[in-house]
Swiss-Prot record:
Any one GO BP annotation for this protein: actin filament depolymerization
Record's keyword terms, sorted: Actin-binding
Pfam families (UniProt xref): Cofilin_ADF
Similarity remark: Belongs to the actin-binding proteins ADF family.
Keyword Lipoprotein set for record: no
Gene Ontology cellular component annotations, sorted alphabetically: actin cytoskeleton; cytoplasm
SUPFAM superfamilies linked: Actin depolymerizing proteins
Protein role: Actin-depolymerizing protein. Severs actin filaments (F-actin) and binds to actin monomers.
UniProt cross-references to Gene3D superfamilies, sorted A to Z: Severin (3.40.20.10)
Highest classification ranks of the organism: Eukaryota, Viridiplantae, Streptophyta, Embryophyta, Tracheophyta
Matching PROSITE patterns: ADF_H (PS51263)
The protein, known as: Actin-depolymerizing factor 2
Signal sequence annotation: none
Length: 145
């Protein structure tokens, strides 16, 4: 019996587009992107890659990519230097669900979160955010150290 990754049902939320895992591996292993934004395409009944951010883009560029009134999932590759002067990188999974987004969108993203997280196995930290203060750069710094 073949298993289709993009298959979805009411209890598990949306399916996941086949290229999501490859995009994650490009961020994780090849450092091809600074961040990836994912959105739910209701007509396709799956989570898809909406945008990738170049490694030269800033954290402000990433935040500007999150819609003010709609939900998204995101990965952010956070580079930092430890107290011992060692360069490190941690990948954050962010479930962005602003309080101003539609209730239906919040429900769809909530029920689909576990499914996309299965495809993104290997991120270090998860943040659930409802407003910009919850994804401030300081929040990432504190979690990464």
């Amino acid at each position: 019996m073949a298993f289709m990754r993009s298959h979805s049902n009411a209890s598990s939320g949306m399916g996941v587009a086949p290229d999501i895992r490859d995009t994650f591996l490009e961020l994780q292993m090849k450092k091809a992107f600074r961040y990836v934004i994912f959105k739910i395409e209701e007509k396709q009944k799956q989570v898809v890659v909406e945008k990738t951010g170049a490694t030269t883009e800033s954290y402000d560029d990433f935040l500007a990519s999150l819609p003010e009134n709609d939900c998204r999932y995101a990965l952010y590759d956070f580079d930092f230097v430890t107290g011992e002067n060692v360069q490190k990188s941690k990948i954050f999974f962010i479930a962005w669900s602003p309080s101003t987004s539609r209730i239906r969108a919040k429900m769809l993203y909530s029920t689909s979160k576990d499914r996309i997280k299965q495809e993104l196995d290997g991120f270090h930290y998860e943040i659930q955010a409802t407003d910009p203060t919850e994804v401030d750069l300081e929040v990432l710094r504190e979690r990464a150290h």
